[in-house]
């Protein structure tokens, strides 16, 4: 089963478009959108072909080293998906 996570991203004022463009280019980011609310961007990360040794520590590394260090990012909140649902139920 693939590991997936949502990363909620706060940006410094005026940096949202640049951050979004940069985040969308990251290899594990499948989707990223600007949103209204407490956060500015919600990114969906998915790891399709994982080695059996993949760990949350590796996800943490990707978030802290590849996303938080993007110029304009002020903070993030990561939420790991535990169960996926499709339009027809679980899946």
Where are these regions (language model features)?
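A compositional/biophysical signature of low hydrophobicity enriched in polar/charged and small residues
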Residues: 1-91
């Amino acid at each position: 089963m693939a590991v997936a996570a949502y990363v909620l991203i706060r940006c410094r004022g005026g940096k949202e478009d640049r951050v979004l463009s940069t985040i969308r280019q990251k290899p594990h980011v499948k989707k990223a959108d600007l949103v209204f609310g407490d956060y500015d961007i919600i990114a969906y990360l998915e790891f399709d072909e994982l080695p059996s040794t993949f760990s949350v520590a590796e996800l943490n590394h990707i978030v802290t080293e590849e996303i938080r260090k993007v110029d304009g990012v002020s903070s993030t909140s990561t939420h790991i998906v535990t169960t996926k649902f499709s339009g027809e139920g679980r899946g």
